[in-house]
Regions:
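Conserved phosphate-coupling serine/threonine residues in phosphotransfer and NTP-handling enzymes
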Residues: 115-117
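ABC transporter ATPase nucleotide-binding domain signature
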Residues: 126
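Non-catalytic, low-structured ubiquitin/UBL-interacting segments
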Residues: 1
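N-terminal helical cap/lid subdomain that shapes the substrate entry/recognition surface
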Residues: 4-17, 22-99, 109, 119-123
Length: 128
Protein backbone atom coordinates (compact mmCIF):
# COMPACT_ATOMS: atom_id res chain seq x y z
CA UNK A 1 0.00 0.00 0.00
CA UNK A 2 1.42 3.37 -0.90
CA UNK A 3 2.02 5.96 1.78
CA UNK A 4 -0.72 8.26 0.49
CA UNK A 5 -3.36 5.52 0.83
CA UNK A 6 -2.57 4.73 4.42
CA UNK A 7 -5.00 5.77 7.10
CA UNK A 8 -3.81 6.55 10.58
CA UNK A 9 -5.75 4.77 13.29
CA UNK A 10 -6.19 8.23 14.83
CA UNK A 11 -8.43 9.11 11.87
CA UNK A 12 -10.92 6.31 12.56
CA UNK A 13 -13.97 7.57 14.44
CA UNK A 14 -15.73 4.24 15.01
CA UNK A 15 -14.38 0.71 15.32
CA UNK A 16 -16.80 -2.18 14.75
CA UNK A 17 -15.99 -5.67 16.00
CA UNK A 18 -17.84 -8.97 15.75
CA UNK A 19 -17.53 -10.78 19.07
CA UNK A 20 -18.27 -14.37 18.13
CA UNK A 21 -15.31 -16.30 16.67
CA UNK A 22 -13.58 -13.00 15.95
CA UNK A 23 -12.46 -11.42 19.21
CA UNK A 24 -11.89 -14.93 20.52
CA UNK A 25 -10.59 -17.78 18.36
CA UNK A 26 -12.88 -20.37 16.79
CA UNK A 27 -10.75 -23.01 18.50
CA UNK A 28 -12.45 -22.18 21.80
CA UNK A 29 -15.50 -24.00 20.44
CA UNK A 30 -17.70 -21.53 22.32
CA UNK A 31 -20.25 -21.40 19.51
CA UNK A 32 -20.38 -25.22 19.48
CA UNK A 33 -21.02 -25.10 23.23
CA UNK A 34 -23.75 -22.50 22.73
CA UNK A 35 -25.27 -24.65 19.97
CA UNK A 36 -25.42 -27.66 22.28
CA UNK A 37 -26.81 -25.59 25.16
CA UNK A 38 -29.44 -24.15 22.80
CA UNK A 39 -30.48 -27.66 21.76
CA UNK A 40 -31.16 -28.48 25.39
CA UNK A 41 -33.14 -25.28 25.82
CA UNK A 42 -35.26 -25.98 22.71
CA UNK A 43 -35.95 -29.54 23.87
CA UNK A 44 -37.00 -28.36 27.32
CA UNK A 45 -39.05 -25.41 26.08
CA UNK A 46 -40.94 -27.42 23.45
CA UNK A 47 -41.14 -30.63 25.49
CA UNK A 48 -39.45 -32.73 22.80
CA UNK A 49 -36.38 -34.96 22.66
CA UNK A 50 -32.92 -33.65 21.77
CA UNK A 51 -32.98 -35.07 18.24
CA UNK A 52 -36.28 -33.34 17.43
CA UNK A 53 -35.02 -30.19 19.12
CA UNK A 54 -31.91 -30.23 16.94
CA UNK A 55 -34.09 -30.45 13.81
CA UNK A 56 -36.29 -27.55 14.98
CA UNK A 57 -33.24 -25.51 15.95
CA UNK A 58 -31.56 -25.94 12.56
CA UNK A 59 -34.81 -25.40 10.66
CA UNK A 60 -35.49 -22.10 12.44
CA UNK A 61 -31.88 -21.01 12.02
CA UNK A 62 -31.98 -21.72 8.29
CA UNK A 63 -35.34 -19.99 7.78
CA UNK A 64 -34.90 -16.97 10.09
CA UNK A 65 -31.15 -16.63 10.61
CA UNK A 66 -31.66 -17.12 14.35
CA UNK A 67 -33.23 -20.02 16.21
CA UNK A 68 -34.58 -17.47 18.68
CA UNK A 69 -36.58 -15.73 15.95
CA UNK A 70 -38.28 -18.99 14.97
CA UNK A 71 -39.11 -19.77 18.58
CA UNK A 72 -40.64 -16.32 18.98
CA UNK A 73 -42.72 -16.55 15.78
CA UNK A 74 -43.91 -20.14 16.02
CA UNK A 75 -43.77 -20.96 19.71
CA UNK A 76 -44.41 -17.68 21.51
CA UNK A 77 -41.05 -17.55 23.27
CA UNK A 78 -40.30 -14.43 25.28
CA UNK A 79 -36.71 -13.48 24.36
CA UNK A 80 -36.00 -12.52 27.98
CA UNK A 81 -36.57 -16.14 29.02
CA UNK A 82 -34.25 -17.34 26.28
CA UNK A 83 -31.43 -15.00 27.22
CA UNK A 84 -31.84 -15.73 30.92
CA UNK A 85 -31.40 -19.45 30.30
CA UNK A 86 -28.72 -19.14 27.62
CA UNK A 87 -26.38 -16.66 29.33
CA UNK A 88 -25.05 -18.63 32.31
CA UNK A 89 -22.60 -20.75 30.36
CA UNK A 90 -19.12 -21.93 31.16
CA UNK A 91 -16.74 -19.47 29.55
CA UNK A 92 -13.57 -21.16 30.77
CA UNK A 93 -12.78 -22.20 27.19
CA UNK A 94 -12.32 -18.53 26.28
CA UNK A 95 -8.72 -17.85 27.23
CA UNK A 96 -8.00 -14.38 28.57
CA UNK A 97 -6.22 -12.22 26.01
CA UNK A 98 -4.92 -9.13 27.80
CA UNK A 99 -2.80 -8.11 24.79
CA UNK A 100 -5.85 -7.92 22.54
CA UNK A 101 -7.74 -6.04 25.25
CA UNK A 102 -4.89 -3.55 25.58
CA UNK A 103 -4.66 -3.11 21.80
CA UNK A 104 -8.38 -2.40 21.54
CA UNK A 105 -8.25 -0.04 24.53
CA UNK A 106 -5.53 1.99 22.79
CA UNK A 107 -7.70 2.59 19.74
CA UNK A 108 -9.13 6.08 19.71
CA UNK A 109 -12.75 6.54 18.86
CA UNK A 110 -15.95 4.74 19.61
CA UNK A 111 -15.95 0.93 19.79
CA UNK A 112 -18.99 -1.16 18.90
CA UNK A 113 -19.19 -4.91 19.40
CA UNK A 114 -21.82 -6.98 17.62
CA UNK A 115 -23.09 -10.37 18.75
CA UNK A 116 -26.24 -12.45 18.31
CA UNK A 117 -26.12 -13.13 22.02
CA UNK A 118 -27.24 -10.96 24.90
CA UNK A 119 -25.40 -7.92 26.16
CA UNK A 120 -24.73 -9.89 29.36
CA UNK A 121 -23.03 -12.65 27.35
CA UNK A 122 -20.87 -10.08 25.57
CA UNK A 123 -19.89 -8.51 28.89
CA UNK A 124 -18.91 -11.89 30.35
CA UNK A 125 -16.82 -12.81 27.30
CA UNK A 126 -15.13 -9.41 27.22
CA UNK A 127 -14.17 -9.70 30.89
CA UNK A 128 -12.17 -12.82 30.02
Amino acid sequence: MSQRNRISTDQVETWIFDLDNTLYPVTTRLLAHIDEHMGGFVAKYLGINREEAHQVQKSYFKKYGLTLRGLMIHDGLDPAQYFEEMTPMDLNEVDPNPLLGADIARLKGRKIIYTNASARHAELVLKR
